[in-house]
Amino acid sequence: MLVKADMTKDIAQVMAEVGRKAKAAAAPLSIATSEQKNKALNAAADAILEARADILEANRLDLANAEKNGMAASFVDRLTLNEARIDAIAEGIRTIATLPDPVGEVIAEWDRPNGLHIERVRTPLGVIGVIYESRPNVTADAGALCLKAGNAVILRGGSDSAHSSAAIHKALVKGLEAANLPADAIQIVPVTDRAAVGEMLKGLGGAIDVIVPRGGKSLVARVQSEARVPVFAHLEGICHLYIDKSADLDMARRIALDAKMRRTGICGAAETLLVDRAVASTHLAPILGDLAAGGCEIRGSAEVLALYPAAKPATEEDWSTEYLDAIISVALVDGISGAIDHINRYSSHHTEAIVAEDAQTVARFFNEIDSAILLHNASTQFADGGEFGMGAEIGIATGKMHARGPVGVEQLTSFKYRVRGSGQVRG
């Protein structure tokens, strides 16, 4: 149950207790069998479907507050739950249950000349703190992924989705209880005060092993600045789509429309369209016409405006903006070299896509752009753990340490070495 900050215990005490419970739950969870964890996940999926009416009612409360507070349409879309999205949440949890258990997997093994046999084996990270904004589905995704990887998790969602997240969390706890796993293995921060985030970033007295922020630039920047524990960071999704002169126009039109407009409020939505200057006279107008017909605002460079006068002028700020809305910035570039230069200058290193048929051009795109996910002849909206076969994701990591790209069950593990001998001494 979520409560306000005016309580008998102060925030630090409350959060210290949350950390203590998570640490205690992490030990038995780390040695839970695959069967136990899968039973908990499937039971949680059942509980979510059984609680459908309660979850939708809780979501209605959150949506009413969002409307009262005048939140943007893209924000409301991320917050909204409906029958189909609840079905998808439950199905995502079931899919995670079907994934191979990473815990105990032997990643590598070798023998030494002295007879020692060495194995590198996956282990849980321990306790993961997940701080996210108003996406109720993250409550389920993060809880389920951490459970599958044998980690306890502390969930701190945005206050705007508090009712929805609490209803989903209740179902996750039912799943744990059905498998005789500790209910404290998946906790939701019981206070809405933002001071709770500060306590999590301090590590809760050594209880938290890693923090995963999932949200806007200001949230992630705060986490990176203040965290005293390791962070899997995802700053923002300034994703680019480049249409090369070798591209099939019909394919380019389909991909551009999907990459921008399928869901505008997700981090994998394309925010900048780059078109090879060599085909601008034939390709630009059809592609932008499709986007405009779909309700997208076009912001173009001076060259783009000359070819497509319906566009609005783009400013320098547009090239580094994550709109999360039906807006796209458009520029012409000198082939693959121009596209690479633009992307490496403005990208957040999340996801970039190219539409092209020339193999050498595609090879340069893959080799010379340093982003977590690169796609060829496919929409940027495939930048998703579920689409990668991971069941779901806890976020898209844009850093380079430990995890990069979709953070699924494998990325939520560490490893240890098991060394087997037969009496060897170094002497």
UniProtKB/Swiss-Prot annotation:
Q: Where in the cell is it found?
A: Cytoplasm
Q: Name one GO cellular component term.
A: cytoplasm
One term of GO molecular function: NADP binding
Name the pathway.
Amino-acid biosynthesis; L-proline biosynthesis; L-glutamate 5-semialdehyde from L-glutamate: step 2/2
Which Enzyme Commission number(s) are on file for it? 1.2.1.41
Role description: Catalyzes the NADPH-dependent reduction of L-glutamate 5-phosphate into L-glutamate 5-semialdehyde and phosphate. The product spontaneously undergoes cyclization to form 1-pyrroline-5-carboxylate.
The protein's matches in PANTHER family, at most eight in alphabetical order, are given as: DELTA-1-PYRROLINE-5-CARBOXYLATE SYNTHASE (PTHR11063:SF8), GLUTAMATE SEMIALDEHYDE DEHYDROGENASE (PTHR11063)
* Protein name from the UniProt record: Gamma-glutamyl phosphate reductase
Q: What is the lineage of its organism?
A: Bacteria, Pseudomonadati, Pseudomonadota, Alphaproteobacteria, Hyphomicrobiales
